[in-house]
Structure formats: C-alpha cells, structure tokens
Amino acid sequence: MKHLAAYLLLGLGGNTSPSAADVKAVLESVGIEADSDRLDKLISELEGKDINELIASGSEKLASVPSGGAGGAAASGGAAAAGGSAQAEAAPEAAKEEEKEESDEDMGFGLFD
C-alpha cells in the first residue's frame, strides 16, 4: 500500500510514469524502506495505464458490490420500534394491575389514610 501511495503522489506531482527509482526515493525521503519485489510488481502492473482511469474503474467496481450492512440495520430498527411500542402498551396495564393489588393488601383497613 505504501508503494502505491508513493506512486500516486508522484502522479499527482506531474510524473505521469514514475519509475521504481522514483517511488523508492519518495519512500526513503520519509524513512520507509522499499520492498523491491513488490515495487517491481507494482510498476509492471501499472505500466502504460492512466491512474485516473484505474481509480474510476475501481470506484465503479466498489459501487457494484453490495455492502449488506444497511439493510439489516433498518430491519432490526423497525422490529425494535414495533417491539418497543408493544412494551409501552403493556406497561400501563401492568401499573393498573399493581395498583389494584396494593389496594387489596391493606384489606380495607386504611391504616395510613
């Protein structure tokens, strides 16, 4: 990834076809040791290709891949809202039942009235 980042920096700087030596110089300028095998592979893969076209192509491919995370969150959010309203309805009924039970506990002797 660091090799690709250096390659892209050189491209942004105006070098349309950076060499392995150019990429190595960028990496060494910030204290990173370049892996010559990976660097040679990167240079051979990108040789003769336009960086902007590669980025656009990659963006199209990423956009076509479904992420899957948003659908489940929306479904679970709706289920939680439905479950929450059912619990909210049950709570007042439970409170009414408790009040009736409390009034029965003193057996009609209102000691603290």
UniProtKB/Swiss-Prot annotation:
This is Large ribosomal subunit protein P2. Transmembrane segments: none annotated. Plays an important role in the elongation step of protein synthesis. HAMAP family: Ribosomal_L12_arch (MF_01478). Residues 62-113 are annotated as: Disordered. The keyword Phosphoprotein applies. One of its GO terms (cellular component) is cytosolic large ribosomal subunit. The gene is ALTA5.
